């Protein structure tokens, strides 16, 4: 008796268009994974070992190793053989620096940051909003001893920073609520604001006095006072701030420091061709 032979249906070869689509999908995935690695490395100056980097990114060790090899060949990452750790490379800094250069007001702002530093004797910062986070573009360091600050290029939640609250005060309550929905209200310290109602009260106060205060909400022991720099449409272009230890930014100094920051921000607004918004009665 003849045995029935079950023949498997021949698989039709993929068209060139399908091959191209598969190649594109694979390429996009690799780019996303490589960028995740760079972003993770940028979070910690101490660097990461391969296994830790795989855990942080949720990728397999072999995938991370393969992508690191490519990134290292292009100098986007570098390997410290002494500690067996990976770090952000020089090329990442070069590419990232174009962000600050594109915001071509950074160089013009430096003399005003120096003035702010000299008037307050504290570190002066220039920051902008990027994707609903605060990014520090440049700063003029205080001559006083300072604890750690947000590093240049570092990102911090808008609700947890003086600069962020200064900018949020120019937004409608609906827009602020949307940002809270997107990013939450992280508790970074025991003094962080984690209730929307409390934040809205603070923003109303910021609108009245023209400057915002971060009172150890991002880092214990540090205070920050910030005011907005406006563009030619009276919209927030950036913000400047002074940061210092609570032992120096005392309650007695806050009002005077707030006035100085607000006035220098207004001067920088005019210098950049911006227009201060009309003060509502």
PLM region spans:
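A structural signal for short hydrophobic beta-strand segments in well-ordered beta-sheet cores
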Residues: 77-79, 126-127, 229
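Cysteine/selenocysteine-centered motifs that mediate thiol-based redox chemistry or coordinate metal-sulfur cofactors
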Residues: 175-178, 182-184, 265-281
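Extended hydrophobic
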Residues: 195-267, 281
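Amphipathic alpha-helical effector-binding/dimerization core
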Residues: 82-183
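Short, structured helix-loop boundary elements
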Residues: 27-31, 50, 85, 89, ...
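Short, solvent-exposed recognition segments
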Residues: 2-17, 145-218
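N-terminal helix-turn-helix
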Residues: 2-107, 114, 266, 270-274
